[in-house]
Curated annotation (Swiss-Prot):
TM helices/strands, residue ranges: 8-28
Name of this protein: Potassium-transporting ATPase KdpC subunit
Keywords: ATP-binding, Cell inner membrane, Cell membrane, Ion transport, Membrane, Nucleotide-binding, Potassium, Potassium transport, Transmembrane, Transmembrane helix, Transport
Organism listed in the record: Pectobacterium atrosepticum (strain SCRI 1043 / ATCC BAA-672) (Erwinia carotovora subsp. atroseptica)
Protein's job: Part of the high-affinity ATP-driven potassium transport (or Kdp) system, which catalyzes the hydrolysis of ATP coupled with the electrogenic transport of potassium into the cytoplasm. This subunit acts as a catalytic chaperone that increases the ATP-binding affinity of the ATP-hydrolyzing subunit KdpB by the formation of a transient KdpB/KdpC/ATP ternary complex.
InterPro entries reported for this sequence: KdpC
UniProt keyword Cell membrane, yes or no: yes
Main subcellular location: membrane
GO cellular component: plasma membrane
Length: 191
């Protein structure tokens, strides 16, 4: 009986600590220290949520920058279906996907430069919101023509939204596609 009582006490104590006290403490600290991040890094426009800076979105309309292809199968950028495509480099399905994406970019962008790899291949999560500045510059003329803006204006926006990690030796510069497209809409909305 003594072992049962001490086991039950230990069970209840651990249940309270790990099931109530610790989650409550971490939630309160996160809301106090990092409120934006704790709530999903949501982006608001006109008091409405338009997305998260952590999750990519599909921009299929002409005049918007495109992010990395999504690997989610049922719907593009579905966070509930997050995961890589898991296609091996030798898989013919991967070759087909890359070929279709390359054909799209050759048709959409009259640019003779090589297509950046991240515009052809999905990320590990299939949800990346960022592209490299090079991938953004590859699309710059396409976006400028669709919006009736100068290439220089588009380049300045890309430069303004290029983020580098701190310290700089970790990671590469990136451009958040959602933030860049929102800035484009503020600068010159599509008709």
């Amino acid at each position: 009986m003594r072992y049962l009582r001490s086991s039950l006490f230990l069970f209840l104590l651990l249940l309270l600590v790990t099931g109530l006290a610790y989650p409550l403490l971490t939630t309160v600290l996160a809301q106090w220290l990092f409120p934006t991040q704790a709530n999903g890094s949501l982006i608001y426009r006109d008091n409405a949520v338009v997305g998260s800076s952590l999750i990519g979105q599909s921009f299929s309309r002409t005049g918007y920058f495109q992010g990395r292809p999504s690997a989610t199968s049922d719907a593009p950028y579905n966070a509930l279906a997050s995961g890589g495509s898991n296609l091996a480099a030798s898989n013919p399905a991967l070759d087909k996907q890359i070929g279709e994406r390359a054909a799209y970019w050759h048709q959409a962008v009259s640019n003779q430069q090589p297509i950046p790899a991240e515009l052809l291949t999905a990320s590990g999560s299939g949800l990346d919101p960022q592209i490299s500045p090079e991938a953004a510059r590859y699309q710059a003329l396409y976006v400028a023509q669709a919006r009736g803006m100068s290439l220089q204006q588009i380049q300045q926006l890309i430069d303004r939204f290029t983020e580098t990690s701190k310290p700089t030796f970790i990671g590469q510069p990136t451009v958040n596609v959602l933030l860049l497209n929102l800035a484009l809409d503020e600068e010159k909305p599509l008709p």
